[in-house]
Amino acid sequence: MHQQHSKSENKPQQQRKKFEGPKREAILDLAKYKDSKIRVKLMGGKLVIGVLKGYDQLMNLVLDDTVEYMSNPDDENNTELISKNARKLGLTVIRGTILVSLSSAEGSDVLYMQK
């Protein structure tokens, strides 16, 4: 009777090392805006305003007390908000891939603008 050995039994098990590239710094320092109200314009003409609770280097955001507004489709600059279509979202995660711009809700400081 012949015993069959698989190749994995003959070789000692090797630990696979997970590739870890250099840690990237955030595109912008949002730490000073943590627990502050920010205004986030999203692709598709939506705007959300909420309190920044967290973020990562990919610009994914966690906002609390978030309110979503639809902008007027005829307004090219998206400055006119349709407040009757405001929705309270509460705690929200926003993916960095859909951000158009990010600014302070109190002032007019633009923190981030998509190129």
UniProtKB/Swiss-Prot annotation:
Gene Ontology CC annotation, any one: nucleolus
Q: Which domain of life is it from?
A: Eukaryota
Q: Name one GO biological process term.
A: mRNA splicing, via spliceosome
Q: Which residues form the Sm domain?
A: 25-108
Q: What keywords sit in the KW lines?
A: Cytoplasm, mRNA processing, mRNA splicing, Nucleus, Ribonucleoprotein, RNA-binding, rRNA processing, Spliceosome, tRNA processing
Output the SMART domains linked to this UniProt entry.
Sm (SM00651)
Disordered as annotated region, ranges: 1-23
Q: Which InterPro entries match?
A: Lsm7 (IPR017132), Lsm7/SmG-like (IPR044641), LSM_dom_sf (IPR010920), Sm (IPR047575), Sm_dom_euk/arc (IPR001163)
| Principal place of residence | nucleus
* Classification via SUPFAM superfamilies: Sm-like ribonucleoproteins
Which compartments is it annotated to reside in? Nucleus; Nucleus, Nucleolus; Cytoplasm
In alphabetical order, the GO MF annotations are: RNA binding
Basic and acidic residues bias: start-end ranges: 1-10
| Job of this protein | Component of LSm protein complexes, which are involved in RNA processing and may function in a chaperone-like manner. Component of the cytoplasmic LSM1-LSM7 complex which is involved in mRNA degradation by activating the decapping step. Together with PAT1, the LSM1-LSM7 complex binds to osmotic stress-activated mRNAs to attenuate the osmotic stress response, probably by limiting ribosome access to the mRNA and consequently translation. Component of the nuclear LSM2-LSM8 complex, which is involved in spliceosome assembly.
Spell out the note in the miscellaneous section: Present with 3070 molecules/cell in log phase SD medium.
Q: What assembly does the database describe for this protein? A: Component of the heptameric LSM1-LSM7 complex that forms a seven-membered ring structure with a donut shape. The LSm subunits are arranged in the order LSM1, LSM2, LSM3, LSM6, LSM5, LSM7 and LSM4. Except for LSM1, where a C-terminal helix crosses the ring structure to form additional interactions with LSM3 and LSM6, each subunit interacts only with its two neighboring subunits. The LSM1-LSM7 complex interacts with PAT1; within the complex PAT1 has direct interactions with LSM2 and LSM3. The LSM1-LSM7 complex interacts with XRN1.
Give the protein family.
Belongs to the snRNP Sm proteins family.
Q: What is this protein called?
A: LSM complex subunit LSM7
Question: What is the organism lineage in this UniProt record?
Answer: Eukaryota, Fungi, Dikarya, Ascomycota, Saccharomycotina
